[in-house]
From Swiss-Prot:
Belongs to the two pore domain potassium channel (TC 1.A.1.8) family. The keyword Methyltransferase does not apply. It comes from Caenorhabditis elegans. Expressed in body wall muscle. GO terms for molecular function: outward rectifier potassium channel activity; potassium ion leak channel activity. The chain crosses the membrane at residues 22-42, 144-164, 225-245, 281-301. GO terms for cellular component: membrane; plasma membrane. Keywords: Glycoprotein, Ion channel, Ion transport, Membrane, Potassium, Potassium channel, Potassium transport, Transmembrane, Transmembrane helix, Transport. Residues 328-347 are annotated as: Disordered. Residues 116-136, 253-273 dip into the membrane without crossing it. It is a multi-pass membrane protein. InterPro entries: 2pore_dom_K_chnl, K_chnl_dom. The gene is twk-18. This is TWiK family of potassium channels protein 18. Disruption phenotype: Worms display uncoordinated movement and paralysis.
Amino acid sequence: MAIVAQGVSTILTTFQKTFKGLLPLIILVAYTLLGAWIFWMIEGENEREMLIEQQKERDELIRRTVYKINQLQIKRQRRLMTAEEEYNRTAKVLTTFQETLGIVPADMDKDIHWTFLGSIFYCMTVYTTIGYGNIVPGTGWGRFATILYAFIGIPLTVLSLYCLGSLFAKGCKMLWRFFLKSTRVVSKDLSNKISEAADNIEEGTTAITPSAEKTENNDDDLLSFPISGLLLITVIWVIFCAVLFTFLEEWDFGTSLYFTLISFTTIGFGDILPSDYDFMPIVGVLLLIGLSLVSTVMTLIQQQIEALASGMKDNIDQEYARALNEAREDGEVDEHVDPEEDPENNKKSFDAVISRMNWSKRGLYYLLPDSQKKELAKQSEKKMGRKSIKIQTDNDLLETLIREEILKAELNNEMHKYTAPRSSHQPKLVYSDVREKEVPIEVVRVEHFNHGNEDYLEHDI
């Protein structure tokens, strides 16, 4: 029972996390249906009335035109044909002329755009910012509703695309881990982790917990996933959509591919459009998935560039250390120059070090952002002045420790352990074993010893 309960709990937890991740997408779907109903109610009847009115105007125009032409023909033919025959012939000529111009009678089944399915497609073109232009509001209220709908829908779409991209990224990481496991590919930093764990055990420190390692690996898995694989998936999806459109719209493959790419990049010229509005929701779903793929790929490319820049900085820093040593050996860099006192000389030294790097490392350096270049220059200043600062700090610290050691010996009456007998005219030398070194200094206080009262003046040697 415990195993069953644990399994049910795991399933519920997974479902809860998945539902939480899909919640913005569910809200977006509901928002789409709500917007479709609103625009359908606002624009649907208006469009129908406009089409009916246009058809009436066309019919009236044709009737008047035919009548006038008929009257003219009657007068010209001098009653060689009946009026009905002349009317029919003239109407036929005008109808042919009208069809040649592309003016055809309105089809209430095909020419209606503001159906519920068409309204869904319109909502998708609004909040994805594609905007083909084939469906537009014709009323003031419709335009006002479009503006409000876009203000809410566009941020919601961005959030939904982010959630879809995150789910897609998780799927990529699962496939990548499965690939590594099935091919028994060992991570390149496994040996480093083993060494670190061994060092931690030897030093008595706490090793990294499996949960911490799992969290770190989950964060790095997506960056380690080859970006070429994601690009390949995106290309496959684009080709799939293009092939699907060739069957839905009877387009050639070039036209379908053009429409797909124009849509996925949210350019949306509107010159190529689906003709069957019953398939509009399917087109919208395909475009939404394509946009999420494009968004994911662009985000991952940015993360890959940032990771590459970080790796470049580490490589350049190592190369800098090697080039700095070579420059110092050749005398191009002065070891004792304080960069704060002579920044101009430090700049020349830094340029000399950069010039000694190989062309690939030097190229990576020039590709770094300005902020990281400045950081590397600051590291250069620290390295250039590190030796003199280190020597200065060591001397001061050593002197302080020696004086503390002498004071302790004085308080414990153990000065005889550190003193060496000298003649009366020679200064008394005191030795300290601080840091396993014997550093002589002259006594600066008045010392009293068992063999007599003698005064000694001290000063540093």
